[in-house]
Every structure is written in C-alpha cells, then in structure tokens.
UniProtKB/Swiss-Prot annotation:
GO cellular component terms given for this protein: host cell nucleus
Subunit structure, interactors included: Interacts with host proteins P40, P34 ands P20.
Protein name: Protein Ac34
Location(s), subcellular: Host nucleus
Kinase found in the keyword field: no
Keyword annotations from UniProtKB, A to Z: Host nucleus
Gene: Ac34
Length: 215
C-alpha cells in the first residue's frame, strides 16, 4: 500500500436541497447560456482527452465502469434522490455521456484516482489542471443554477465517482465514500454496482493507497 501524507478534508456536502423554489419553472436553456457553456464543454473534452492520454502513458488497464454509468444515465438511474427532490425539473433525468467521459471512467475504475490523489484536498496548488479547471467547488444546492449546470454535465458524474475514491482512500473519511456513490447511483459499493450489470471486478472497493493528514 502506498501512503501519501496529505490533509484530506471532506468536500462540501454532496446534496443540499433546502430553500427550493415552490413554483416549477420550464426546463429552458437560453441561447445566451448555450453560448457561454459551449467553450467550457469544448475545453472539458480537450482536457479529459489529456487525462486519458496520461492513463495510457502509465499503462493503466481500462475497465467497464464508464460503460455501466453511461447505461445507467440512459436508463434514468443516475442521481435518483436529487432528481426526486427536484421540483423544478431542472436536473436531467436521462443523459448520454460523451465517448471521452466513458473512456475516462473506464480508466478511473482501475486507477482509483491515484494519478490525481492530491486533487480534492485542501492543497489546491497541487491539483492537476484538469481538476483545477473543471471540478465544481461552489454551493451544492439545486436552487443554484451553476450547481444544476454542473450536475447536468459529464463532470457532475465524474466528480461523484472521484469523490468516492477520494473518500475511500482517506484515513478520516472512508465512511463518506458510500454517501458519494449513493448520491450518484443508490449503490453502496462499486462492486455491487458492476455486478448488477454482470461485471465481476475483484478489489474494486479496496483502496490502493491511503491519504494521511498533515498541516
């Protein structure tokens, strides 16, 4: 086991559903909002490809996690509790992940966030460019438009899987790993999730390293 000394505070609460607006509003994305969002999507696609290339350079073996998560998105099985509480119907009930996101998650299954093990810690100056540019660090409240846009993006899915591995590897927050995965899928472990789609993956929920505290 590789031990990495780093203070690993828990990210902000995964779901904050208070103060929801009582009156539903149509799910409409304005042209202006599309124009603002498009460059971010393009940058994400380019940056996630760089991350994929890094996995390949490290000879990481891809799994099938991305394919399973993509299937769940098409079946409307992602973010079930958030969608149930979304009175305004702003969060996408079904989704199709991009091919690059699927490939990234396939590699992440076996990398377990080791390549980016210092991302999601308080030491944001040690974060990689991909997570510095695309990880959401704002208010987690579905009345916040930025948070809804994040949840509807591929990165909204990626972050919850990465937070699962982050908490799993932390000496202080292992118990919170289940919470991250349940927010995305209702499953408490990735092995149970994968088994439900006929994939047997040994040691999937065993951390390959442990993050230790430091000041």
């Amino acid at each position: 086991m590789t031990t990495v000394a780093v203070n690993a505070p828990l990210p902000p609460p995964l779901v904050e559903l208070c103060n929801r607006r009582p009156i539903p509003t149509p799910r409409i994305i304005s042209l202006q909002r599309q124009l603002i969002s498009t460059p971010v999507v393009k940058n994400y696609q380019a940056d996630v490809q760089e991350a994929i290339n890094d996995f390949k350079r490290l000879n990481i073996t891809p799994g099938h996690l991305g394919e399973v998560i993509d299937t769940m998105g098409q079946q409307g099985k992602l973010l079930p509790e958030i969608i149930e509480a979304d009175d305004d119907f702003k969060v996408n009930q079904t989704r199709n992940l991009s091919c690059k996101t699927v490939e990234y998650l396939n590699f992440l299954e076996n990398d377990k966030l080791f390549r980016c093990r210092l991302c999601y810690t308080h030491a944001d100056w040690l974060w990689c460019d991909f997570h510095r540019n695309h990880a959401y660090r704002g208010t987690r409240d579905i009345t916040c438009n930025n948070y809804v846009e994040h949840l509807n993006s591929d990165m909204g899915v990626v972050m919850l899987i990465e937070e699962y591995f982050y908490c799993l590897s932390s000496c202080n927050f292992k118990q919170d790993a289940k919470r991250a995965l349940q927010t995305l899928t209702k499953f408490e472990s990735l092995s149970d999730l994968m088994a439900s789609y006929n994939f047997s993956t040994p040691d999937l929920d065993t951390n390959a390293y442990e993050l230790m505290d430091f000041e």
